[in-house]
């Protein structure tokens, strides 16, 4: 019996080591994939997201928890005024930090569309679907079809592909948008002044628009944008 128990323990131990090695390998592959996407930008093509997993929401490092004021500056068109909005990240039932998708999208939408925005609604059956309602019977149906991210306590690095269908009376238009996000704590001395204050978060978003040819894996981006983002902590 003792020999059998020992063999079982050894078997479970080896399985655990194998799983950890497998997760580390996948994470390494995803990191390489994401770095390649950033390096290819802006001469970027729609690709196969072979490590994609849309069964889980984006998970953020613990230091993202709380509410933040975001300033997003278009680097390509730096003459444009920055877009400023609030976002919130919270600990979900699985004890991981996720974004408040509807609230955050609505906040960004208000900053972009102003009073034209009516509301943003999440699909109760899927974390990947969302509808943005605008005035004059105008609405945008957004579906996340691909998602890659690495798990790293020091950085948030992810890539999502969204199919957006814009509906307005008498017409509809499909567009594919890829957003690569890379954020980390800013280099800052602010904690020396106030130890209770969280570090600002800094980073970039690389956005590529591919048009309406859904399913074609070799489309060149028809439009690219790069944004510099700064998050300033508001409250928990």
Task: Cite the ranges covered by each PLM segment.
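Classical Sec-dependent N-terminal signal peptides that target proteins to the secretory pathway
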Residues: 1-24
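Residue-level detector of short, conserved catalytic/binding motifs and their immediate flanks
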Residues: 8, 66, 181
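Amphipathic/hydrophobic helical signal segments and adjacent flexible N-terminal regions
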Residues: 21-67, 71-113, 209-236
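Active-site acidic/histidine clusters and adjacent loop/turn architecture
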Residues: 114-121, 127
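Short helix-loop boundary/capping segments
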Residues: 124-218
């Amino acid at each position: 019996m003792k020999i059998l128990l020992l063999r079982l323990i050894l078997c479970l131990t080896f399985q655990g080591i194998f799983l950890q090695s497998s997760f580390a390998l996948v994470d390494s592959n995803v990191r390489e994939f994401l770095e390649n996407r950033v390096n290819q930008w802006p001469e970027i093509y729609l690709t196969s997201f072979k490590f994609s997993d849309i069964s889980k929401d984006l998970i953020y490092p613990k230091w993202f928890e709380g509410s933040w004021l975001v300033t997003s500056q278009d680097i390509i068109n730096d003459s444009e005024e920055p877009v400023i909005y609030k976002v919130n990240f919270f600990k979900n039932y699985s004890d991981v930090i996720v974004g408040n998708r509807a609230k955050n999208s609505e906040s960004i939408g208000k900053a972009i569309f102003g009073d034209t925005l009516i509301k943003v609604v999440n699909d109760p059956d899927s974390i990947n679907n969302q509808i943005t309602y605008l005035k004059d019977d105008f609405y945008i149906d957004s579906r996340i079809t691909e998602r890659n991210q690495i798990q790293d306590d020091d950085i948030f690095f992810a890539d999502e592909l969204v199919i957006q269908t814009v509906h307005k009376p008498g017409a509809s238009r499909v567009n594919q948008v890829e957003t690569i996000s890379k954020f980390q704590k800013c280099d800052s001395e602010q904690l020396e002044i106030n130890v209770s204050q969280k570090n600002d978060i800094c980073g970039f978003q690389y956005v590529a628009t591919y048009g309406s040819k859904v399913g074609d894996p070799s489309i060149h981006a028809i439009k690219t944008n790069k944004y510099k983002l700064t998050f300033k902590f508001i409250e928990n």
